[in-house]
Amino acid sequence: MRPNLWRTISLLSGRDGARAPLGRRSFLGLGAAFTGSFALGSTPANAEPASPPADAPWSQSIGAGVVDRPYGRPADTEAGVIRRNVPWLTAGTESSVSFSPLQDLHGIITPNGLFFERHHAGRPDIDPDQHRLMIHGLVERPLVLTMKDIVRFPSTSRIHFIECPANGGMEWRAAQINSLQFNHGMVSCAEWTGVRLSTLLEEVGIRNEAKWVMVEGADGAHMNRSLPLDKCLDDCLVVYAQNGEALRPEQGYPLRLVVPGWEGNVNIKWLRRIKLGDKPWFSREETSKYTDLMPDGTSRGFTWLIDAKSVIT
């Protein structure tokens, strides 16, 4: 018997170097040891000896320098991991959506370049030095803030999902596209950095009769929605950074609203105006689009909350 195998038997028996009787469990362990020993020792005589892998071409030359890519990007072999749209879904791309490739993502954070897009009048090109945020209406001290003013306020960072209420809509009537990306790709997650909306509202002073807040974007559609004041004072953020860098233009650069847990369209991008009032505004978007048509012909509005969904990637 091989010395190393006898050593194993000795350890299993609990007595180093002594040939003691084996119990049932030790005997089963001994059988496993024999099996492993014979398996390791049964290499055919004509088998090629194991050898280390050969050096690949990229291991035989000097790689690219540190300034080759001043702004990092994915490897060339990941070129297929991109947002995609469905050409026949809308008449044009300016009022449309692009889908995140959920099947290719890892963890919960969506890279900025893969965060889904939803525009109502295309992506504007905004000069942050010229951008302004006006807060007015039922307030004590109306304000017009520059981006430099906003970043001076105390900041906070939080991780939140944003989901379009139409996510999954490709399958509402019947299965149409055999693709996880197109069926469920209107949801993404990021770390957002900015100022609590409550902080800005405290700065202007809220009048007692104020109950609602209208938020408006600077895009060509002047996308706007009405929100209850209570929600705005709870957890809403006015953000200027996403995943550690300035917002991308398609995500609202230089300023957007994040309304945690509520449907994506209320997370107004390119935020330029906040107005406080005593009732909702019933804007075009929240009456003609973001309402629920009921079986009796009536419409149900202000159904902001996004229900939980699940999908296997």
Enumerate the predicted regions with their spans.
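Generic secretory/membrane-interface signal
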Residues: 40-42, 67
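N-terminal secretory signal peptides
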Residues: 1-22, 26, 33-36, 40, ...
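Residues within well-ordered alpha-helical secondary structure of globular protein domains
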Residues: 30-33, 203
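Structured, non-membrane catalytic/scaffold regions adjacent to prosthetic-group chemistry
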Residues: 48-313
